[in-house]
C-alpha cells in the first residue's frame, strides 16, 4: 500500500490489480473509488483532471493516495461502498442518502402497530419508501384513523385508555377494549391499504358489519363502513391506473439527469430526480440509494448495470430481484416530462453567451451517421425547438451516394440534402447544427455551410471527452457547463438513438427480404403486405391467423417462415 509522496508519482506505482483506492487530504479520504485495474483507473483520473473540474479538485486537494488490493471486482465494489458509508468523502455522491428514505413498518407483535422507520433492518413488514417524509406520516395517521391500530409502544397494561382512544386513533387493546379477532381484521385491512390487495379482506369486513348490526353495535358498524369505503375507493383507483407489474423501481437516465420512479401495488407512488456530474455517477447513485433503502422485486433501467452491481443489489435484497430494460410507455413519458424540466433559463442564457457568444437558440438540429460494417448507411436529423425535443420534425436519411465506410462523405451527403430543404423554405431554419463527432465532422459541416451559403452556426460534440468543437477553433469542456451539457448532451444522444434505430430497421428489412425471397408461395405483392404490417419476421409468426387472413395471407406461411428462422 502506498502511503507517502506526491499523488502523481503514487499513481504511476499503482498495481494493475482489482481493488479500492482512496484520495486523501491529511488522514481523511476526500474521494473513494474501485477499479478492475487500479493503475489504469487512476491514470484516467489524472488525465481527466486536465479538463474536468471535479477531477481537477480531487487531484489538487489530495496530498496522499492509498489503495487496497482485492481478489476480484465484486469484492472491490463491496469494500468501496462500506468505506464510502464509513468516511463519507466530500467528492462521492454515494453517501448522500443518509439513513435512507422513510418506510412504514407493520410490526411483528401480538398486537401489531404501524411505525415510520428508516433503513431496512427491522422486524416486521416494510412498505415504501416514501421520498417525502410528511407523506409517510400522513399515511400512518390515516391508518390510525381508519383501523385504530395501537399508538403506544411498547404495549402497556392499563386500567384506563389513553387520550388517543378518546380521539378515535386507537382501539385500546391494552385495556381489552377490542377482541384479538377484531384487531387482527384491522391489521389485515391496514395491510390491504398498504399493498392494494383489497379483494381478500373486503368480504371479511362485510361479514363483520353484518355481525355488528345484528348485535346493534352501530358505532362499530359505522367504523367498519368507513374502512370498506376507503378500500373500495383504493380498488377503483387501481383499476384505472394499474401498471403491468406490482412492485418495482425504475431508473431512467436522460441527458445529465437520473430519474427514479417507485411503483408499489401496480401504481406510481413517488418520483425523484438526481443531477449527475458524470456518467460514472449513475451506478454510484443507485448503490447509495439501495445501501439505505428497500430493494423491490424488480429493478428497471434504460441503461446496462454491471454484473457486480446487480450481484450486490441481489445480496442486499436477500431474495430474488429481476432486472429489466423494458420501461412501460406511460411511465417513460412521465420520466421524460419531469427530467426535461428544471432548466434554469438565466443560467442557460449565461452559458450560451459566455461560452458560445450567442443568445439561446430557438432551433438546434442534431446529426449522426450509423451503419453496420459499411452496410445500410443512414443519417439522422433530430430537432430541439423552443426548449425541448420536437419529434414531429425529426428526419432520417438513407445515404445514396456511397457504399463503403466513410462517415465524412455520408455526413456531407446528409447535411447537403438538409441544407437544400432549409434554403427552399421547406423546414424552419435552425440557429445551430450540432454534429456527433470531433474535428473531422466539424470540418464537414463548415464545408457544407460555405458551399450552400446556409447561415447557421456549426458545432461538433465529441462523445468520450464531452468536448464541443467550435468553428473558430475553440474546445469547450461541456461538463464544466451543466445546463449547456444537459441540452447538447440530450440532442447528441437523441441523434445517435434515432440513427441507430433506423439502421436496425433497414437491416431487419433486408433480413426479411432475404428470408421471404426463399419461400415458395410469397410473391412481390405478399412481401409488400408483410413489410407494411410487420416490423420483423418474429412479429409475423406471432400474428393471429385471423389477422393474416384479413390481410389476404394464408396462415400456413407462418410455418414456412419458422422453418427458415430455426
From Swiss-Prot:
GO MF, any single term: excinuclease ABC activity
Domain GIY-YIG positions: 16-93
UniProt-listed GO biological process terms: DNA damage response; nucleotide-excision repair; SOS response
Top-rank taxon: Bacteria
All copies of domain UVR, residue ranges: 199-234
Family, similarity comment: Belongs to the UvrC family.
Name of the protein in question: UvrABC system protein C
Natural source organism: Aquifex aeolicus (strain VF5)
